[in-house]
C-alpha cells in the first residue's frame, strides 16, 4: 500500500485558506495519510482534522514545517518526491513509474515555489502544461497513481457515513447517543 503525504508550499493564510483546505481534503479523500503545511495556519490544521474526525480515517496535518528539511528527511528514509507544476513532464508520461513508488511526497505550491524544488524532486509533473488548480492537480495525480481504487475507499472510525444514492441524500450518524 502506498504511503502518500502532501507538502503544501507557499500557503498565504489570508489568500489561500480555501484552496489549501481543499488540497488537504482532496488528498485525504483519495488516500493520502497527511499534509505538511510549510506555513503557520492552525485554522487549516483544525478544519481538516475536524473533517477527518467526523468522516473517518487517520489524516493528519503538520503545521509550520520547514519544507526543505521535510524533503531531505523524506528522501533519507527512502521516499520519493513528486512536484506538481505546470512546467513538468505530463502526468501520463510519469504516472506508471510514480505508481510503483511505495513512499511518495507530493509537493504542491501556492505562490511561486523556490527553484530548488525542481532539483530536489524526483519528478516534476504537469497536468497538461497549462495553468491549473492545485486541487485538480492533486486529484488527477492521486487518481492516476493509485494502487487501489481511491473512489471506493472506506474510512474507519467515521462518525458520519454517506449512503450512495442515485437521487436524494442520506447520511448515517454512526455515533450512538446514550
UniProtKB/Swiss-Prot annotation:
Specifically catalyzes the AdoMet-dependent 2'-O-ribose methylation of cytidine at position 56 in tRNAs. It is an enzyme of class 2 (transferase). This is tRNA (cytidine(56)-2'-O)-methyltransferase. One of its GO terms (molecular function) is tRNA (cytidine(56)-2'-O)-methyltransferase activity. It is found in: Cytoplasm. Belongs to the aTrm56 family. It comes from Methanococcoides burtonii (strain DSM 6242 / NBRC 107633 / OCM 468 / ACE-M). The keyword Oxidoreductase does not apply. It catalyses: cytidine(56) in tRNA + S-adenosyl-L-methionine = 2'-O-methylcytidine(56) in tRNA + S-adenosyl-L-homocysteine + H(+). GO terms for cellular component: cytoplasm. Homodimer. Its EC number is 2.1.1.206. S-adenosyl-L-methionine binds at residues 84, 109-113, 127-134.
Amino acid at each position: 500500500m502506498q504511503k502518500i503525504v502532501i507538502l503544501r508550499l507557499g500557503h498565504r493564510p489570508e489568500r489561500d485558506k480555501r484552496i489549501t483546505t481543499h488540497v488537504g481534503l482532496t488528498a485525504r479523500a483519495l488516500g493520502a495519510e497527511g499534509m505538511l503545511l510549510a506555513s503557520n495556519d492552525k485554522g487549516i490544521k483544525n478544519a481538516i482534522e475536524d473533517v477527518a474526525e467526523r468522516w473517518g480515517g487517520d489524516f493528519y496535518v503538520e503545521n509550520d514545517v520547514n519544507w526543505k528539511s521535510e524533503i531531505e528527511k523524506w528522501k533519507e528514509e527512502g521516499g520519493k518526491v513528486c512536484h506538481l507544476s505546470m512546467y513538468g513532464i505530463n502526468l501520463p508520461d510519469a504516472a506508471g513509474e510514480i505508481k510503483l513508488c511505495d513512499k511518495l511526497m507530493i509537493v504542491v505550491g501556492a505562490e511561486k515555489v523556490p527553484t530548488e524544488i525542481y532539483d530536489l524532486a524526483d519528478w516534476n509533473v504537469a497536468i497538461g502544461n497549462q495553468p491549473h488548480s492545485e486541487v485538480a492537480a492533486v486529484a488527477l495525480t492521486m487518481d492516476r497513481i493509485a494502487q487501489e481504487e481511491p473512489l471506493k475507499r472506506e474510512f474507519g472510525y467515521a462518525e458520519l457515513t454517506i449512503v450512495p444514492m442515485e437521487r436524494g441524500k442520506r447520511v448515517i450518524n454512526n455515533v450512538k447517543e446514550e
